[in-house]
Swiss-Prot record:
One of its GO terms (biological process) is proteolysis involved in protein catabolic process. The lineage of its organism: Bacteria, Pseudomonadati, Pseudomonadota, Gammaproteobacteria, Lysobacterales. ATPase subunit of a proteasome-like degradation complex; this subunit has chaperone activity. The binding of ATP and its subsequent hydrolysis by HslU are essential for unfolding of protein substrates subsequently hydrolyzed by HslV. HslU recognizes the N-terminal part of its protein substrates and unfolds these before they are guided to HslV for hydrolysis. This is ATP-dependent protease ATPase subunit HslU. CDD domains: RecA-like_HslU. Pfam families: AAA, AAA_2, ClpB_D2-small. It is found in: Cytoplasm. A double ring-shaped homohexamer of HslV is capped on each side by a ring-shaped HslU homohexamer. The assembly of the HslU/HslV complex is dependent on binding of ATP. Signal peptide: none annotated. It comes from Xylella fastidiosa (strain 9a5c). HAMAP family: HslU. Belongs to the ClpX chaperone family. HslU subfamily.
Amino acid sequence: MPSKTDFTSSTMTPREIVQELDRHIVGQQAAKRSVAIALRNRWRRMQLPEELRNEVMPKNILMIGPTGVGKTEIARRLATLANAPFVKVEATRFTEVGYVGKDVEQIGRDLVDTAVKMYREQAKVRVRTQAEEYAEERILDVLLPRRSVGIGFDVDADVIRQEPSAHESETRAKFRRMLRSGELEEREIELDVAVNVSMDIMTPPGMEEMGQQLRQMFSNIGGGKSQKRKLTIKAARPLLIEEEAAKLVNEDEIRAAAIEACEQNGIVFIDEIDKVVKRGDTVGGGDVSREGVQRDLLPLVEGSNVSTKYGTIRTNHILFIASGAFHLTKPSDLIPELQGRFPIRVELDALSKADFIRILTEPKAALTKQYQELLKTEGVSLDFTEDAIDRIAEIAYLVNERQENIGARRLHTVLERLLEMLSYESPDRDGESVTVDADYVNAHLGELVKDPDLSRYIL
């Protein structure tokens, strides 16, 4: 059975987690620290005696800040760092029980699905060497069928198979060497491959779980069947390795370990939580439904049992991180019971011009670096001067101030507009070097920035 340590972030300290997040996200140190501490507390809890461990509840986090400042990006990067079952959901996709749409228990089911998939992949990695050996033997058996005796006798295959002669063993060893050196990759062979019955089933909104169950039922009907296919050895090898790995892993152990991982180390990120908050000065059916979603979320966050196709999970120790812009509402508009379940509040800062400059230059995959690498594929060398970076950041900041503040997402729009013609002409400019300076930026964007009406529609 996979060990619990497979799904914990025990090797990373809060400082290391923050440093890793710093490589991709500019600023927002308070949010990074809170997330890092929460992740480390998962490991700390697992070191406690079992009796005390069950009493230590996770401190859920509510991140508050305008759009485009890094809330969702923190969640995305967290998923790669957590090394634990992790799901990110949009609060707006859920509806109160009785309404058309997803119910909040789907969150628990999605978390278990994620964990089972992760554990299955880990298990397949562990048995891959053995699976490759079995796949190689199956290919050799097709290339060099082994002699058997006892035609018409109902006896065990091991009994009727003759020991290979010295010549056969030598030939098999020769083919094995050719197979491993890649000499036979394009050779066609005919072999039995397991049939995976798949069926597309369209279901109404909110009934996705039923669709999944029906698909699984139909796939089980064809389980165990195989069909003969002609494939090159190169194409057949990965299919056979996958088939052999699936035989070697223990599905029951995977499911049990996945449920354990969800209960002890699971993390749920709920985005756009402010969209299911009732505004203080409005009354209406929509607001009633929004409050209903909060009330449905409450038992999940407090701790309840959720039935999944793999078994029942308890949500008592799952860490919930919620985020929202709260433009038209405020955190105190959440129902009081739910407010109390998110004791850690973190406010993310709006981005300044200086932040935009850092976003364009510091992250490992900064936007400017992305455009440079994309155009390099066409043979165009692109370079940004410091004054160009400064001007791009200034334009993005000004447009955000004049119009809707969409944070760092404004940089995508500005850069795409700035480099539109270059991207269009780049296939015809192979071998050229292009330097983007402040004059280049003003020439392509200056008029748009001066005209507020025009920039409203284009930037």
